[in-house]
Amino acid sequence: VFVNHPERVSFEVATEMVTKVEFSVPGENLDYFLINGPTMKEVLMRYTDITGKPSLPAPWTFGLWLSTSFTTNYDEKTVNSFVDGMFDRKIPLSVFHFDCFWMKDFNWCDFTWDSRVFPDPEGMLKRLKAKGLKICVWINSYVGQESSMFKEGVEGGYFLKRPNGDVWQWDMWQPGLAIVDFTNPAACEWYSKKLEALLDMGVDCFKTDFGERIPTDAVYYDGSDPVKMHNYYTYLYNKVVFNVLKKKKGEKEAVLFARSATAGGQKFPVHWGGD
């Protein structure tokens, strides 16, 4: 069953009755598809006929990815100890991923390496890539008030707004964070250029974190219904990032490492099932 509904959907899976799956939405209309296979492979083929086909990720993406994850205090020496430790143990490594602390804390996101621990990011990336590694860095679509990008975003009108015209902000992840409005073409271009600079530096792909905690009372540049945009936002977010990667790396090399998704999100591979 493909529930083609961008708003909140309630699924009851064998709860009210163990032999049934129920789904419902507020209101009077619901669009859904019953997709026959009969095999699951055929179901997926037909589902992607409706919602879009993913491209085949590059061969290197099928190798082992090593992440700093929630390592909160690390520098190039620490990174090399992780990488060399894998090589010393004869464990092949394809990608090294820098999670959130490649940027200075409380500046997420500003897309700027924390110079306190990474004074020579371009040199570091070259040294890591000389070991045969691809490089991934963590990003999201939130901009904290301490970020150097916050003022740019406010002045350019690149963030979601409140009904009174103020920037929509909250403190859930970073103090006073704002959310990039991907219905605004100028905001998409601004965000894309920040990512292009990282790719020019030697980054190969991005972990597109978050994208699911999107308010339903915000005002969008194009007037979109914020309730319907709650799920669709992540599609636009990952589309923008994937298009940057296609532009700079080519379609056969473009890959991201996405957390949130909605119907059609598979067109921007890949997603992980962790969070």
Where are the predicted features?
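Catalytic-domain carbohydrate-binding cleft regions of carbohydrate-active enzymes
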Residues: 1-275
